[in-house]
Amino acid sequence: MSKLKTRSSAAKRFKVTATGKILHKKAGKRHNLSKKSESRKRRLDIPGEIKSVDRWKVERMLPYNL
């Protein structure tokens, strides 16, 4: 059987932790930051965990990271 390819777009966007969680960056931290509060900007720094309904899709795109 041939090797499975990793989706490079998914590899750039998601990070798999040692415990198996799949994390992503939160949207809204690129521009127009002056109108956002400091606490909101800090909250956007914390990575989010993907939803369970989307997990199988990401797992198929990252075959060797899990």
Swiss-Prot record:
Residues spanning the signal sequence: none
Gene Ontology terms for molecular function: structural constituent of ribosome
GO annotation, biological process: translation
Regions annotated as coiled coil: none
PROSITE patterns from the UniProt entry: RIBOSOMAL_L35
Cysteine disulfide partners in this protein: none
Keyword DNA repair belongs to the record: no
Keyword terms: Ribonucleoprotein, Ribosomal protein
Protein name per Swiss-Prot or TrEMBL: Large ribosomal subunit protein bL35
